[in-house]
């Protein structure tokens, strides 16, 4: 089946695969409302429909990503609502049984987030947590009672801070999946910088990805 992955749009990677695996473990009702934050090419939103959800909303700040996700949904003949906007802003006031998030999380020399270009899909400030922390603060209000947040990121930007912030927001959070994968092009190009900051060991060539599962129990 044709799946579009144009330049400048985040294509499915190892983190996408790990999050899709965690998604596959979630029992979804047909009427479940699912949100895919930072959808990129739409791969995870499409996976949610294939997993049984019939009400899937995907969000991305990039116009190119939004158009790509819409085209991929049309090519797959699967019903997905795709909205353009920053993170959770387009769906304020709505509730979801499942939120999927694969945000930018790579530590970068620049403190500010890039405003355009492909790097918006991975650069996340000096500590890699600028976008992660916004999701940790904002996602709980969008979860229906019993709703679940599945959030994937690299251990380079800290697993415990994510768990702590989600728990502080009233969610029950734990690590659901872990996987070590070889550095991709971005981390290979940034290895010297990460090594200089003590985030990786000299000569290290793999990173650990984690999926955090957080549930709104009340």
Task: Give, region by region, the residue ranges found by the protein language model.
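Conserved SAM-binding motif I beta-strand of class I
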Residues: 55-60
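Conserved Class I SAM-dependent methyltransferase catalytic core
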Residues: 8, 129-187
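A short acidic, Gly/Pro-enriched loop at the edge of an enzyme's catalytic core
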Residues: 88-99
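Mobile active-site "lid"/loop adjacent to the S-adenosyl-L-methionine
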Residues: 103-131
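SAM-dependent Rossmann-like transferase core, predominantly class I methyltransferases
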Residues: 1-51, 62-68, 89-90, 189-218
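Residue-level signal for inorganic ion chemistry
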Residues: 16-19, 102, 135, 149
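Conserved acidic residues
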Residues: 32, 97, 147
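Conserved SAM-binding strand-loop segment of SAM-dependent methyltransferases
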Residues: 77-87
């Amino acid at each position: 089946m044709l799946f579009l992955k144009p330049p400048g749009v985040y294509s499915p990677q190892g983190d996408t695969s790990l999050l899709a695996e965690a998604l596959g473990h979630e029992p979804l009702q047909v009427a479940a409302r699912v949100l895919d934050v930072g959808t990129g090419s739409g791969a995870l939103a499409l996976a949610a429909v294939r997993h049984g959800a019939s009400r899937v909303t995907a969000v991305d700040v990039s116009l190119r990503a939004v158009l790509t996700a819409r085209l991929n949904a049309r090519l797959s003949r699967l019903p997905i609502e795709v909205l353009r906007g920053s993170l959770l802003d387009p769906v304020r006031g709505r509730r979801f049984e499942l939120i999927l998030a694969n945000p930018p999380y790579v530590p970068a020399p620049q403190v500010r987030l890039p405003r355009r270009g492909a790097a918006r899909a991975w650069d996340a400030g000096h500590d890699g947590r600028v976008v992660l922390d916004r999701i940790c603060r904002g996602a709980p209000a969008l979860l229906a009672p019993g709703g679940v947040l599945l959030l994937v990121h690299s251990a380079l930007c800290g697993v415990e801070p994510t768990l702590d912030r989600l728990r502080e927001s009233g969610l029950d959070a734990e690590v659901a999946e872990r996987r070590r994968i070889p550095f991709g092009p971005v981390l290979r190009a940034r290895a010297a910088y990460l090594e200089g900051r003590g985030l990786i060991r000299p000569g290290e060539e793999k990173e650990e990805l984690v999926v955090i599962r957080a549930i709104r129990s009340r």
